[in-house]
Amino acid sequence: MTAADTPAPRQDPLAFFLDKAVPEAWHAVGPLASAARAAAEQAGLDRQLVELVNLRVSQLNGCVFCLDRHTRQGADAGLSVQRLGLLPAWREAGAVYSEQERATLELAEAVTDLPEQEQLNYVQASTAAALTDAQSAAVQWVAMVMNLTNRISILSHHPVRRRDG
């Protein structure tokens, strides 16, 4: 490769959106997310629980775009201000979150953090009392898809617009 073959650098490297750069890959994410949500619904997991997973994963990853979006979607699904606000400290929040929600959040965190195999096995086994196999699989898929979309948004520097009110 010669200097003449080297592409010119972008004027604004922060104005590079992965979803726009490879739209075919981005368009494949939508059906994957839909399939994960459908699996959750078929397993008997409600929209509030799915939004708790989306929010917690986005908190762990620090994705402001997804946090903004899923905070609004969680509120639209009926999550209270209290449950939205306490989510970062869900372990200390006691009865604010049900046993099923706590197991779901534990599993979603493990999917996001990918601990050592022994710890992952422990989390999967310990959450089995509160989640069926279908629910466990759905939670893991929802968390994996959210991790994917978080990474796309973070790497693309997707902006968050201020909303008053």
Over which residues does each language-model region extend?
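Hydrophobic alpha-helical segments
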Residues: 1-165
